[in-house]
Amino acid sequence: RQFKQTIKEADGILLIMPEYNWSVPGVLKNAIDWLSRGEKVMIGKPVMTAGVSPGMMGTIRAQLHIRQILSSPGVQGRLLPPAGNEIIINLAEQKFKDGRLVDEATLQFVDGVIQRFIQFVQKG
C-alpha cells in the first residue's frame, strides 16, 4: 500500500532499469501490474525511462518494451516523448567509475533530458 501511495503522490516517475533477456526486469513488470489494479495510480502520471547496460545496444529493447507496458490499459502513464529523450547508456564500464557516471558527453545528455522531464512534469 505504501508503494502505491508513494506513486500516487509523486509528480512524476523516473524508471531506471537494466535489461534482462531483451526485456524489463520481472520485478518491475510485477510492480507496474500491481499499480494497475484497483485504484489505477499510474493513469496520466508523467513517466520517463532510462537504462544502463554493459552491452553495445544499451537497454534499447527493454526501453521499447516498457513503453508498451506503460501505454497499456490500466497503466496509461503519460510518457515523455522518445525523440531525443531516451536515456540508454551503453558500454557502462567505459562510462562509469566507482559507481559514478564520469563520461562528460553522457552527463550533459542526461542532464538535458532530466531538465526536459522536469518541464514535462510541470506542464501537467
What are these regions (language model features)?
Residues 1-5, 106-109:
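A short, well-ordered alpha-helical element
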Residues 2-76:
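Helix-loop-strand module that forms the ligand-binding subsite of alpha/beta enzymes
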Residues 77-124:
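Glycine-rich phosphate/pyrophosphate-binding loop and the adjoining helix
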